[in-house]
Structure formats: C-alpha cells, structure tokens
Amino acid sequence: MNIKSLLLGSAAALVAASGAQAADAIVAPEPEAVEYVRVCDAYGAGYFYIPGTETCLRVHGYVRYDVKGGDDVYSGTDRNGWDKSARFALRVSTGSETELGTLKTFTELRFNYAANNSGVDGKYGNETSSGTVMEFAYIQLGGLRVGIDESEFHTFTGYLGDVINDDVISAGSYRTGKISYTFTGGNGFSAVIALEQGGDNDGGYTGTTNYHIDGYMPDVVGGLKYAGGWGSIAGVVAYDSVIEEWAAKVRGDVNITDQFSVWLQGAYSSAATPNQNYGQWGGDWAVWGGAKFIATEKATFNLQAAHDDWGKTAVTANVAYELVPGFTVAPEVSYTKFGGEWKNTVAEDNAWGGIVRFQRSF
C-alpha cells in the first residue's frame, strides 16, 4: 500500500462518515407564521381580536381634571378657594358571538384624587372618595345583564342632561349590583325588568346613607321605551324593598333639528323623603328639563333646569369645546336656590358655583 492509496481510502471513509452523520442530523422545524392582531369592527371602533380566539377586546377610558370655585351648589357652602380633583378611568370591553347571542363584558376601574382649597385629601362631589373603585363589572348575554352597573332607574330613561352638575336635585342612586333583562324590538320599542341590590353610598340628602337591601327581597325596576328619528319617550317604575315604597319617572326627548334637541322629565315618589334609594328628590315630585345645541363641529352648548316639591331650584349651563379630537374643555356655571323646606338644611339660600373640566378620552 502506497501513500496515494492511503489518502484515497481516508477520503472515502470521511465521506461515508459524513453521510451517516447527515442522516442522523435533527432538522429544524419551519418557523410558525406570526399572527398579527386583527381589527374587529363588529362592536364599534377600537376593538381587536385576542390572538388565537374569536373574542374582540377594546381598551379605552379617559383622564380628567376638574377645577371648582365659588359655592358648592349641592350643599350651599362657600368653598373659600379652589377645589381640584383628578381621575383616571380605565375601561375594558369584550365581545363575541355565541349560539345564545352576543356575549359581552364591561369593566371600569377609577383612580380618583381630590383636594380642597387647603390641599387636604377629601371627598369629591357625590362620587367616591379619593382612591380606587371598581365602578362597573358586568357580563351581558343577549339582553341579560348581571354584575355591578348603574340602576335601570337612571340608565333606561337616559340619565339627565349633558352638564357636570346634573344631579343637584337627585334622581336616584347610581351604582348597584343587579340582574336585568332588556327586550329590544325591531320597531323602536324596548322594555326592561331588573332586580337590584340598591344604591351604593349615594344618599341624596346626607351623601353618606347606604340603601342596600337588608334581606332576600331585591329592589325591582321595570320600564318601557319607544324611540324613533323624532326622539324618544320612556318611563320607569321602581319598588324600594327597604322602605317598601315606589317611585316613577317619565322622560321625553325631541330632536327639533339635527343640531338642536330638548328634553323634559317628571318624577313622583310615594314617600316624600330624599332618604331612599330611588325618589331622592325633595317631596313627592320633581321635574327636570334641558336643551342641547351643537353650534359647530367643536362646540356644544348644554342647559339644564330642575325643581322639586320642597322648593329647591337648580340651573346649570356649559359649553363643551373639543380643542382636538379626544380632548375637551368644558367651562360650566351653576346656580341653586334652596327654598321652602330646604332652607333649614343649608347656611345660604343661594349658591353660585363654577367648574372647568379638562378631559382626554381614548
């Protein structure tokens, strides 16, 4: 055997070994295709599909800063300086289609801070104290809704006007645990029935009273509504199981033009006291009314007036101006006259107050 034979033999052995190793080598799998977030437009703007599911998700909310001066138009006291408050509201909405209808959820977490003219951390208006609160958390399947929401006594008729100090004359408690069902017809007709836990620290008179049910019997709310291009008319009746009394409201909205609309609401309670869950105005009855005028694409004027049986009168006007899309500045002026039986509850009969709200919605 010569040198040439050895070299040829070694080369052949190396080629054979390489072939054997190649046969045993691990082949890397093909990379999986990246699944980009898909837009979901079935439930409105801002939704996207959660990757790997058919559930649509939206993250939204607002950041708000309020500056108040003058009198407190709810209590009639002089602020003697500026009151400031801030809020960050984080909202999460989901939606998907099922064999039983559309399945939705909605949650809202509020981070609040408030300070009076001395910079002392304190209570903001008729809302929650400074801190964090789960304001909404409910599940909805078709017309069925369960969880923490606002009372149908408020929501079904459309709240009050588009002003900040809208409930100086209270129209009932807001947040509550509830089970409700809303039927929506194809001809503008709708109806609702709700079993509610009762108001959460929303006492209209004292601002501190809880109106939760104290047994197994829930509060009951029922309502009917008809809506068309001209406007709408709605009525609700509520039974307060704690005091065993009832209250009712009827509201009508009329669209005069595409830019100008008016509304009027009347209410009656079988118990002439604001210390209850629903009829929190003074006396047997109360009335609210208002108007909205869309002056330009950026500016909207709002006006609301209210009066109750005990002699309180409240008037508020503002202009909401959208500086840029998503950022609105709203200066507002309010006046309250504490007449009749309300005179003994306040230090001053007349209260003038102002507020400027800065809000970025997203």
Swiss-Prot record:
Similarity-based family: Belongs to the alphaproteobacteria porin family.
Keywords linked to the UniProt accession: Cell outer membrane, Ion transport, Membrane, Porin, Signal, Transmembrane, Transmembrane beta strand, Transport
Subunit structure, as described in the record: Homotrimer.
Signal peptide: 1-22
Function: Forms passive diffusion pores that allow small molecular weight hydrophilic materials across the outer membrane.
UniProt topology in membrane: Multi-pass membrane protein
InterPro entries: Porin_alphabac
Other known facts: The pore formed by Omp2a is larger than the one formed by Omp2b. Omp2b pores have optimal permeability to allow growth and protection against harmful compounds. The larger pore formed by Omp2a may be advantageous for intracellular growth, when the bacterium is competing with the host cell for nutrients whose concentration is particularly low within the phagosome.
GO molecular function per UniProt: porin activity
Protein name: Porin Omp2b
Localization per Swiss-Prot or TrEMBL: Cell outer membrane
Any Gene Ontology CC annotation: cell outer membrane
GO BP field: monoatomic ion transport
Annotated Pfam families: Porin_2
Free-text note on domains in this protein's UniProt record: Consists of 16-stranded beta-barrel sheets, with large surface-exposed loops, that form a transmembrane pore at the center of each barrel. The pore is partially ocluded by a peptide loop that folds into the pore lumen.
